[in-house]
Amino acid sequence: MTGTKRNGEEVVNENNNNNVAEETNKKAKVDESSTETTESTSCSLLSRCEKLDIVRKELDVKPWDQGKVTIQELITSLLDKTDRDAFFVADVGVIIKQWQKWVKNLPNVKPYYAVKCNPTVGVLRVLDALGTNYDCASRTEIESVLNLGVDPSRIIYANPCKQISALKFARAHNVKLMTFDNLSELEKIEKFFPEAELVLRIAPDDSKSVMRFGSKFGVHIDDCNDLLEMAKEMNLKVVGVSFHVGSGCQSGDSYADALIMVKSVFDMAKKLNMELTLVDVGGGFTGSDDEKFNAFTKVIREKTAELFSPNVKIIAEPGRYFAAQSHTLAVTVISKRSIKQEDNRQHPRRTSNNMRQYNYYLADGVYGSFNNTKFDYAKVEPLLLKPSTKQPTPCTLFGPTCDSIDVVLKDTQIPELKIGDWLYFQDMGAYTIASSSSFNGFCPPPVYYYNSIPEEELKNL
């Protein structure tokens, strides 16, 4: 099975249908993006189902009947078709279902997908077909979205501290909506992009989140009025307020409290005769806990309706919500070492029954897809591709590189493995591929696309 490179990503299952690709992508190159094409105009008139059908053909998305084929069977069927020692199975059906749930729970909140979470071509194209907008944090992310044929009005440049070169690029391609949180940024924008539409990012209480951003981004509520006054003096257009409660948010109160802060900024702006029309509630949405998601979205629905008039546009920046559950990583054991109790070195473990311990070396590690264990607080669980009747034994899972910190999981227990056995890890779609490197020459795994939603259901989107 062969793969091709697109935006730096290896996409497998390519059917190499150039006509379909041209129709779907609506690709004028970025430096030609000011020219409207017949293809992009006609494509915009297609239904969601028709757009998804084009995307599925381009990515060669295979149907997956989960009632008949388990994830283990699906992975096993791919082993004879690839020579790679690690690969992803991506279910676009998960992304579609997450979008349906979003529309049901937050019908008045427009999602701007956080590209940094998973910038792969499959995820971006499926979300584009569904009508999702994009949160970009860099020139490269903006380029990747514009290359889909996305109108620049569907992008928010949500990085409060931007490079001058990136500001110039955004201006050249009419990406106007962007965040700021300090005077220096206002001065840059005044000089290099004075027509920009600005969103003031405030610092909410993010103490109830796993990953907090308040120490780096967001202006304190007491300093908001001064920044608004400065923007007005510079004749810059401030259109709204944003916040981010942090990744892995644990309480809906964080959104409620932040929205109350946003309302106070709206009141400040009103006294300065500045009309704000946009609220960006940021990210922090879970992709796997429906109960928590339902609770958070209820708070957002009720609080935005209570605090803001209907003409105020509400947007959000979900990332892991769409991507996390969509990807499963399959990885093989490339080496194995038996460890004596007295020779367990950096990863000591003592067992009461002198059970043998093992070091297993996997084809992917923390410099690759498992970087989420270091930077995203992910808890990964190794699952056996083939069932085993053996008793679990103590072990440590290492990645393939020559660095000793390349430890995927230490002091765990799984049945004894042999070289060539396969493990798989679920919920690996968020902050894995995006942050992986080619350290030691180990390239990121390819992605195989499938769809678990029946055709009849897709027709009703």
From Swiss-Prot:
GO terms for molecular function: ornithine decarboxylase activity. Pathway: Amine and polyamine biosynthesis; putrescine biosynthesis via L-ornithine pathway; putrescine from L-ornithine: step 1/1. SUPFAM superfamilies: Alanine racemase C-terminal domain-like (SSF50621), PLP-binding barrel (SSF51419). Catalyzes the first and rate-limiting step of polyamine biosynthesis that converts ornithine into putrescine, which is the precursor for the polyamines, spermidine and spermine. Polyamines are essential for cell proliferation and are implicated in cellular processes, ranging from DNA replication to apoptosis. The active site is at C402 (proton donor). Inhibited by antizyme (AZ) in response to polyamine levels. AZ inhibits the assembly of the functional homodimer by binding to ODC monomers and targeting them for ubiquitin-independent proteolytic destruction by the 26S proteasome. Pyridoxal 5'-phosphate binds at S247, G284, E317, P318, G319, R320, Y431. Substrate binds at F375, D376, D403. It comes from the Eukaryota. Transmembrane segments: none annotated. Its EC number is 4.1.1.17. It comes from Dictyostelium discoideum. One of its GO terms (biological process) is putrescine biosynthetic process. Residues 13-22 have a biased composition (Low complexity). Keywords: Decarboxylase, Lyase, Polyamine biosynthesis, Pyridoxal phosphate. Belongs to the Orn/Lys/Arg decarboxylase class-II family. Disulfide bonds: none annotated. It catalyses: L-ornithine + H(+) = putrescine + CO2. This is Probable ornithine decarboxylase. Homodimer. Only the dimer is catalytically active, as the active sites are constructed of residues from both monomers. GO terms for cellular component: cytoplasm; cytoplasmic vesicle. The record marks H244 as: Stacks against the aromatic ring of pyridoxal phosphate and stabilizes reaction intermediates. Residues 1-35 are annotated as: Disordered. Residues 23-32 have a biased composition (Basic and acidic residues). The modification N6-(pyridoxal phosphate)lysine is found at K116. CDD domains: PLPDE_III_ODC. The gene is odc. Its cofactor is pyridoxal 5'-phosphate.
